[in-house]
């Protein structure tokens, strides 16, 4: 399975990082407290949009050939996108840790670090890179979720906790997670079904911030998800395909938010 392969590779990568810079050194570099900016933009009136910076994926291969993270961030800065998700996973998504630093220089939007967090080391690293939030995936962490969630909060990060089914949702709720991301993509098969959000949202308490991820292709999809009670959507591939046309992406966002 692709997910198992990603996790195996990620664990090796983190061990190499620890060898170069031990976790104790990393912890000493942490500065700044909790801004809460990521959670704030998801909770504002109307549906919020998280625009993703993503060059590739295991299911689609290269999505954006002439990839420039700074150029993409500048587009997101100009249109009514509320937060930016930055893919930092190198091997399978062609991401890079430095993209967060680069984006931070040109954008005022809160940044979500999108990666496969398998070690506490990556949480400290995310804070130092300048992320406002991290993604924690229940199918990757299992019973480690609570500890990783609490550590993330303690260093001043918001946490988007990703689930795909009812069992994973229960684990997230038991850990006290306040931002739940429903991934419409099954990470085991990479099949996508936007109805996953509709099927799971009814089991999520009302005081939880809900994000729908994957398979969101049109403004109509976003308005449909908003009607279900979703607070925010995360859009990657759809935006990457039109990112060079600022008018097109601006119109898409306006229409999705009901102003088009």
Curated annotation (Swiss-Prot):
Reaction equation(s) it catalyzes: 1-(2-carboxyphenylamino)-1-deoxy-D-ribulose 5-phosphate + H(+) = (1S,2R)-1-C-(indol-3-yl)glycerol 3-phosphate + CO2 + H2O
Biological or metabolic pathway of the protein: Amino-acid biosynthesis; L-tryptophan biosynthesis; L-tryptophan from chorismate: step 4/5
Enzyme Commission designation: 4.1.1.48
GO molecular function: indole-3-glycerol-phosphate synthase activity; phosphoribosylanthranilate isomerase activity
EC supergroup of this enzyme: lyase
CDD domains for the chain: IGPS
UniProt-listed PROSITE patterns: IGPS
GO terms, biological process: L-tryptophan biosynthetic process
Keywords for the protein's UniProt record, in alphabetical order: Amino-acid biosynthesis, Aromatic amino acid biosynthesis, Decarboxylase, Lyase, Tryptophan biosynthesis
InterPro entries reported for this sequence: Aldolase_TIM, Indole-3-glycerol_P_synth, Indole-3-glycerol_P_synth_dom, Indole-3-GlycerolPSynthase_CS, RibuloseP-bd_barrel
Similarity comment text for this entry: Belongs to the TrpC family.
Name this polypeptide is given: Indole-3-glycerol phosphate synthase
């Amino acid at each position: 399975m692709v997910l198992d392969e990603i996790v195996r590779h990620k664990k090796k990568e983190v061990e190499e990082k620890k060898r170069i810079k031990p976790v104790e050194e990393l912890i000493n570099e942490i500065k700044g407290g909790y801004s809460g900016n990521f959670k704030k933009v998801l909770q504002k009136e109307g549906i919020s949009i998280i625009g993703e910076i993503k060059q590739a994926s295991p299911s689609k291969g290269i999505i954006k050939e002439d990839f420039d993270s700074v150029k993409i961030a500048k587009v997101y800065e100009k249109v009514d996108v509320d937060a930016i998700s930055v893919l930092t996973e190198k091997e399978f998504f062609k991401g890079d840790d430095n993209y967060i630093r680069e984006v931070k220089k040109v954008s005022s939007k809160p940044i979500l670090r999108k990666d496969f967090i398998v070690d506490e080391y990556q949480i400290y690293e995310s804070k130092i890179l300048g992320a406002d939030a991290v993604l924690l995936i229940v199918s990757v962490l299992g019973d480690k979720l609570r500890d990783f969630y609490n550590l993330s909060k303690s260093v001043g990060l918001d946490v988007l906790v990703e689930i795909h089914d009812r069992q994973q949702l229960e684990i997230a709720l038991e850990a006290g997670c306040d931002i739940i991301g429903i991934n419409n993509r099954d990470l085991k098969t990479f099949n996508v079904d936007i109805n996953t959000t509709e099927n799971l949202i009814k089991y999520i308490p009302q005081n939880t911030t809900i994000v729908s991820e994957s398979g969101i292709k049109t403004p109509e999809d976003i308005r449909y998800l908003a009607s279900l009670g979703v607070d925010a959507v995360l859009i990657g591939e759809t935006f990457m395909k039109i990112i060079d046309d600022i008018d097109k992406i601006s119109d898409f966002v306006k229409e999705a938010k009901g102003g088009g």
